[in-house]
Amino acid sequence: HLAKWIDNSIPVFKQPEFSYIAIVLDDMGLNKKIMSEVVELGGPLTLSFLSYAPNLIEQTTIASSKGHELMLHLPMEPLGDEDPGPGALLVDMKNMELNQRLNLALEKFPNFIGINNHMGSRFTSNSKLMEFLISSLKKRGYLFLDSVTTSRSVALKMGRRLSAPVVARDIFLDDVDSEKEVKLRLAQTELIA
């Protein structure tokens, strides 16, 4: 079966009278203490691990054994000067180099459902590059979750055009470091669901 985004997903037994919320925790893998706390949370949760984090196989095996779903958090070029991290997909790269970086990232650990962008506001707003990325992921059976780091992202439009599994986040829960703000955004998330 080629649809890894289905094969590697955690089954959820839905009752039709309820709405459901998917929570994705990204930037995983760099802080061992946070990782050990997060994997003990109830769930299942979807944990997205940075492609350049250390000990990825060990960390993702632990997360998976605790019942959590896995994603690959792939660095992509942002607007501005911030460094997205090692192995980032950059807008001035040719398809061959993009493909090499993508292949290296996809081999970091097994059993994930797809990728989401780490940063990437410049990359995800480029139609040609997103067509290349989304078609490459579709061929390999992975989904793309757009972190929506820019309102100019073309990911959803490209996913529809290519009949590829592409989804976008609705709300960032913690882009403001405040418990009060996170609770407010959780309430907004419930309203959307």
Question: Which residue stretches match the model-derived regions?
Answer:
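Juxtamembrane proline-rich low-complexity "stalk" or linker regions positioned immediately after a signal peptide
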Residues: 1-4, 8
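Active-site beta->alpha N-cap acidic-glycine motif
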Residues: 9-86
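Active-site mouth loops of central-metabolism enzymes
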Residues: 20-27, 86-96, 175-181
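Short, contiguous strand/loop micro-motifs
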Residues: 21, 46-47, 89, 120-121, ...
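Glycine-rich anion/phosphate-binding loops
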Residues: 52-58, 92-100
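Catalytic domains of cell-wall/extracellular-matrix polysaccharide-remodeling enzymes
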Residues: 95-186
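Catalytic grooves of carbohydrate-active enzymes
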Residues: 192-193
